[in-house]
A protein has these predicted regions:
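Conserved active-site/ligand-binding neighborhood in enzyme cores
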Residues: 1-214
Length: 214
């Protein structure tokens, strides 16, 4: 696990909507991180690489001032046959997004991946309302991370339990659990248990916010 290498990218997006999983209610809040499920799915679609795994986090300065970038979109879904509007939904989204994304590859060295010019800077779409222009993201290569340090702190992303070792999570001290969607085919999937942001863990420094008072 200590020999893993990661490709770090800077991600920017003018408008992004990654909503919380809420069963009921008319208000759908957005998440405050870049979950494993969202970014991994988008990158696999872009590169057609099932051996690619990724997660992300918002830039610390962006996260500190995130309230000024929150906005709400009013969406009125319609019944297909009756053409009658359902109860309007309030969908929260973010503007001027700045984040970091970390890619882990199995079966290919990061160095060979970024040798290709098209892999150093590219666009993807991610999240909800892509057909309305949401979710266009630009990624720029920053560096390859080798031998990251192990720190104890609060997790800054969301990752399924069965992929924790890919991103250096050695110990879960105080978990915050939730569920992320995992596709099982092009038309179906399932929800699997995941560690959410705020979990107290021992893991790689780029994924944790260190505790001041341990």
């Amino acid at each position: 696990m200590g020999n893993n290498k990661y490709i770090e990218y800077e991600l920017t997006s003018d408008i992004l909507c990654i909503g919380e999983r809420v069963k009921k209610g008319t208000f759908k809040p957005c998440v405050k991180t870049i979950p494993f499920s969202s970014i991994t799915g988008s990158l696999r679609d872009a590169f057609n690489m099932p051996n690619l795994y990724a997660l992300g986090k918002f830039d610390p300065d962006y996260l500190d001032s995130i309230e000024q970038f929150r906005q709400v979109h009013i969406y009125s879904p319609r019944y297909v046959f009756e053409d009658v509007a359902k109860v309007p939904l309030q969908i929260e989204f973010l503007t001027e997004v700045k984040a970091q994304v970390y890619i882990f590859l199995t079966g290919e060295a990061p160095e060979s991946f970024i040798e290709k010019k098209e892999n150093r800077e590219f666009d993807i779409t991610m999240g909800a309302f892509k057909s309305k222009g949401f979710g266009r993201c630009h990624l720029s290569f920053v560096r390859i991370i080798e031998n990251p340090e192990i720190n104890t702190g609060r997790l800054l992303s969301r990752i399924p339990e069965n992929y924790m070792s890919y991103f250096g999570i050695r110990r879960v001290i105080k978990p915050v659990y939730g569920y992320l969607f995992e596709p099982t085919s092009k038309v179906s999937g399932k929800y699997i248990r995941a560690l959410f942001e705020g979990s107290l863990i021992e893991g790689y420094d780029f994924l944790v916010k260190e505790e001041i008072n341990k």
